[in-house]
C-alpha cells in the first residue's frame, strides 16, 4: 500500500521513494518520509463484526430455513438406502461415446448459480455427453414412450415411474475436475449404477460416496453388446463383496439376453456407503 501511495503521489510508475524526489510548489526537491505504523494492531486481531452471530450452545434444535421458492438454494434430503434386493428392470439412460468428462456430466458456466439447488442443477446432467446410439448430445430414447428427449427429462420420467436407470460409459469416464455434482445429479435423478470401460479415479470415488455403483466391464468388448432398448437386471447384488464380480443381465427388445460381468473396487467400508445410501448416511447412522 505504501508503494501504491508513493507512485500515485508522484504520478510515475517508475518512482523510487528511496532515491527519487518530488518537486514542491516552491521548486524545492523533497523526499517522502519513510512510512511508520504499528507492527501489530493495538487491540489485537479481533474484529467487532456486527454481522457475526455466535453459534448456539445446543444446536440440536437449530433449523436452517431456506425459501422454498428459491431457485438457487435447496435443502438436501438424504438419499434412500439400498433395500437389500437386486436392482431389476433398469433402463439404459445413455451409452456415452468417447470422452465424457465431469463437464460433460455436469456443465459449469451459467449452471454454477444453481450449485446450491440440486434439483435445478440436475437439469444439466449429461447434456454434453454424446449418445452412442445416435451420436447426438442431449438426445436419448425414453423407453417408456419411445420418444427422444433431453437426458435429464428422460431420467426424471424414469424416476417418476419408479424405474431405475443406469449409465454406460467409455474410457476414463469422469475425467477432469473433482466435481461432486457429477455424482450427485445422477443419484438424485434415479441412476443406480454407472458401468464403464474405465473410470477417472476421483469420479469413481465420488460415485461411491453418493451410494451409487461404479462398475467397470470385465471385458471391455461387452460395451458393444448393450443396446438402446435394453432392460438391465442385477443377478447377484445381494452378494456384493470386496473383490467379487457382479453379474448383470441385459435383456434385449427381442427377448434375447447377454450376461455381462462387472468389476468393482469397493472395500468393506465403501460397500457400507452403498448399503446406507451414501457415505454421509452411514456417518449419521454411526453417530446415532
Feature map (PLM): residue ranges:
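Non-catalytic terminal/interface segments that mediate subunit docking, oligomerization
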Residues: 59-195
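Acidic, Ser/Thr-rich low-complexity intrinsically disordered segments
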Residues: 28-82
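Thiamine diphosphate
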Residues: 1, 6, 204-258, 262-264
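Long, charged alpha-helical interface segments
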Residues: 66, 245-253, 258-288
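Short hydrophobic alpha-helical runs that function as membrane-insertion/retention elements
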Residues: 192-197, 214-217
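Conserved phosphate/anionic-ligand binding catalytic regions in large, soluble enzymes, centered on
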Residues: 1-16, 93-111, 172-185, 266-283
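Mobile "lid/hinge" segments at catalytic clefts and subdomain interfaces of large enzymes
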Residues: 1-52, 208, 240-244
